[in-house]
């Protein structure tokens, strides 16, 4: 069995700071500690709650934590919802990095939301709200500036199921592997791609990208 997160905190802390600097993200010592505390909680609860198939410390650090941090330079807005958040990825890391912004973490699996509530309490994340419900039943007031998802099977499904969550000037951010050209070719006409960002994560094989979408300007309503 490999080393735990706790046994590798020193090297992981250094790598976190190096990666943050490479994407022009400033992290305090407290934020680095919170990120690693979160990863330790994830590791502990994963054994019983099956939050992720990734079990080794290096895999969780790279494929979960660094991958989540990679989107930090691209988010704009103040209020976000992470849909299908699972174990809190990327919502918890983003909430730690941006304490002045608010993040709602939504998942239909009760055990995962119980874990997220424990993380919120343990780390003192006052800018996090958890929701245990299906996305189509959640009616936020006010609506969000942005929807973030790492989990939806397709971008069209994301837009369809999350359409009601954001205001007309809001954004959808879809985290993907290789550029999903076939998905983008099937976008509903009232949506446009505002930008696509290549994401660079050290020691992570394969391509990663972030697709930013919005309601087309000529669409006056999302109805």
From Swiss-Prot:
Keyword Glycoprotein attributed: no
Catalytic activity from the UniProt record: guanosine(527) in 16S rRNA + S-adenosyl-L-methionine = N(7)-methylguanosine(527) in 16S rRNA + S-adenosyl-L-homocysteine
Top enzyme category: transferase
GO molecular function, one term: rRNA (guanine-N7-)-methyltransferase activity
CDD domains per record: AdoMet_MTases
Keywords: Cytoplasm, Methyltransferase, rRNA processing, S-adenosyl-L-methionine, Transferase
Gene3D superfamilies, sorted: Vaccinia Virus protein VP39 (3.40.50.150)
Enzyme Commission numbers on file: 2.1.1.170
Function as written in the Swiss-Prot or TrEMBL entry: Specifically methylates the N7 position of guanine in position 527 of 16S rRNA.
Family to which the UniProt record says this protein belongs: Belongs to the methyltransferase superfamily. RNA methyltransferase RsmG family.
HAMAP family documented for this protein: 16SrRNA_methyltr_G
PANTHER family on file: S-ADENOSYL-L-METHIONINE-DEPENDENT METHYLTRANSFERASES SUPERFAMILY PROTEIN
Protein name: Ribosomal RNA small subunit methyltransferase G
Species of origin: Saccharophagus degradans (strain 2-40 / ATCC 43961 / DSM 17024)
């Amino acid at each position: 069995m490999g080393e735990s997160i706790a046994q590798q905190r020193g090297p992981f802390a250094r790598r976190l700071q190096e990666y943050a600097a490479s994407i022009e993200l400033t992290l305090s010592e407290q934020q680095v500690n919170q990120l690693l505390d979160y990863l330790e909680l994830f590791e502990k609860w994963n054994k019983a709650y099956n939050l992720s198939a990734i079990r080794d410390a290096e895999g969780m650090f790279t494929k979960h934590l660094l991958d989540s941090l990679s989107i930090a330079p691209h988010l704009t807005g103040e209020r976000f919802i992470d849909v299908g958040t699972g174990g809190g990825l990327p919502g918890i890391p983003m909430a730690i990095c941006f304490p002045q912004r608010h993040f709602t973490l939504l998942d239909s699996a009760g055990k995962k939301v119980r874990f997220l509530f424990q993380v919120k309490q343990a780390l003192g994340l006052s800018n996090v709200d958890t929701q245990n419900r299906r996305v189509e039943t959640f009616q936020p007031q006010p609506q969000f500036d942005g929807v973030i998802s790492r989990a939806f099977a397709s971008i069209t499904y994301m837009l369809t199921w999350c359409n009601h969550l954001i205001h007309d000037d809001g954004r959808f951010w879809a985290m993907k592997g290789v550029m999903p050209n076939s998905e983008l070719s099937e976008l509903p006409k009232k949506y446009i791609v505002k930008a696509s960002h290549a994401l660079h994560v050290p020691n992570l094989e394969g391509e990663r990208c972030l697709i930013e979408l919005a309601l087309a300007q000529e669409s006056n309503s999302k109805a």
